[in-house]
């Protein structure tokens, strides 16, 4: 399975994502730069975490307006799988590929620790290797991960099963409404989440709870 990783100034988790995708798929992903207007034929596009363009204006606001994001949107519209992690999630929201907004953590502090995630919807390409209600571990590292959506949008997300990851009870690190940690679009091929599953894919790194997400997204057989 082929994958691509989007590179933008200020992103600093690209090597983590590249290493994870290489380890899981057996093939190094291609990389696409901010000015690229086309993305090769791939099965998965990943937007990693970091601080694109220094998080000026709003987290992800400048990155979302780069030429490469128009190419990402075109691929997503054709059904290509897209995943945005941390700043990648913020970029997807700013680009209009996912609804809602990501605000400053309620603590007003940068949060970096391991948390527990509940699989809210296991009937997606990203979560099909997990069990409904399963609780997994994942690192978080962000300052603006407080997910918010208006009442109508929130009701639609909850009602249509678009909330796929939720911070397990008592572990919400940022104040996200309804403990939301990750959502998908209506078509089910675009995922955004604040935690970093790419940092927990093998035992040598403390566990492999995040591995199944990428295996599912890449369509790797169990």
From Swiss-Prot:
Q: Which GO terms describe its biological process?
A: 'de novo' IMP biosynthetic process
**InterPro entries according to UniProt:** Class_I_gatase-like, PRibForGlyAmidine_synth_PurQ
The annotated pathway is: Purine metabolism; IMP biosynthesis via de novo pathway; 5-amino-1-(5-phospho-D-ribosyl)imidazole from N(2)-formyl-N(1)-(5-phospho-D-ribosyl)glycinamide: step 1/2
Q: Which Pfam families match?
A: GATase_5 (PF13507)
The residues covered by the Glutamine amidotransferase type-1 domain are 3-222
Q: Where are the transmembrane segments?
A: none
EC numbers on record:
6.3.5.3, 3.5.1.2
Summarizing the function annotation, the protein's role is: Part of the phosphoribosylformylglycinamidine synthase complex involved in the purines biosynthetic pathway. Catalyzes the ATP-dependent conversion of formylglycinamide ribonucleotide (FGAR) and glutamine to yield formylglycinamidine ribonucleotide (FGAM) and glutamate. The FGAM synthase complex is composed of three subunits. PurQ produces an ammonia molecule by converting glutamine to glutamate. PurL transfers the ammonia molecule to FGAR to form FGAM in an ATP-dependent manner.
User: Active site located where?
Assistant: 86 (nucleophile), 196, 198
How is this protein organized at the quaternary level? Part of the FGAM synthase complex composed of 1 PurL, 1 PurQ and 2 PurS subunits.
| Chief localisation class | cytoplasm
What name goes with this protein? Phosphoribosylformylglycinamidine synthase subunit PurQ
Where can this protein be found? Answer: Cytoplasm
- Provide this UniProt record's keywords sorted from A to Z: ATP-binding, Cytoplasm, Glutamine amidotransferase, Hydrolase, Ligase, Nucleotide-binding, Purine biosynthesis
What is the species of this protein? Mesorhizobium japonicum (strain LMG 29417 / CECT 9101 / MAFF 303099)
Which reaction(s) are listed as its catalytic activity? Answer: N(2)-formyl-N(1)-(5-phospho-beta-D-ribosyl)glycinamide + L-glutamine + ATP + H2O = 2-formamido-N(1)-(5-O-phospho-beta-D-ribosyl)acetamidine + L-glutamate + ADP + phosphate + H(+); L-glutamine + H2O = L-glutamate + NH4(+)
Which GO molecular-function terms appear in the entry? ATP binding; glutaminase activity; phosphoribosylformylglycinamidine synthase activity
Q: Looking at the keywords, is Nucleotide-binding present?
A: yes
Q: Name one GO cellular component term.
A: cytoplasm
Top-level taxon of origin: Bacteria
């Amino acid at each position: 399975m082929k994958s691509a990783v989007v590179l933008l100034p200020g992103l600093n988790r690209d090597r983590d994502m590249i290493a994870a995708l290489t380890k899981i798929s057996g093939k190094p992903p291609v990389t696409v730069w901010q000015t690229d207007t086309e993305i090769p034929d791939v099965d998965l596009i990943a937007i990693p975490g970091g601080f694109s363009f220094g998080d000026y204006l709003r987290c992800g606001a400048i990155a979302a307006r780069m030429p490469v994001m128009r190419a990402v949107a075109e691929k997503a519209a054709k059904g290509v799988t897209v995943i945005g992690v941390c700043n990648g999630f913020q970029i997807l929201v700013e680009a209009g590929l996912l609804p809602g907004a990501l605000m400053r953590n309620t603590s007003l502090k940068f949060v970096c620790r391991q948390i527990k995630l509940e699989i809210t919807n296991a009937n997606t390409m990203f979560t099909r290797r997990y069990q409904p209600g399963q609780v997994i571990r994942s690192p978080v590292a962000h300052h603006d991960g407080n997910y918010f959506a208006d009442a109508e949008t929130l009701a639609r997300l909850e009602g249509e099963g678009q909330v796929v990851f939720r911070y397990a009870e008592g572990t919400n690190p940022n104040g996200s409404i309804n403990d939301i940690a990750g959502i998908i679009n209506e078509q089910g091929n675009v995922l955004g989440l604040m935690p970093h599953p790419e940092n927990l894919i093998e035992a040598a790194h403390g566990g492999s709870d995040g591995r199944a997400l990428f295996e599912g997204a890449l369509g790797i057989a169990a």
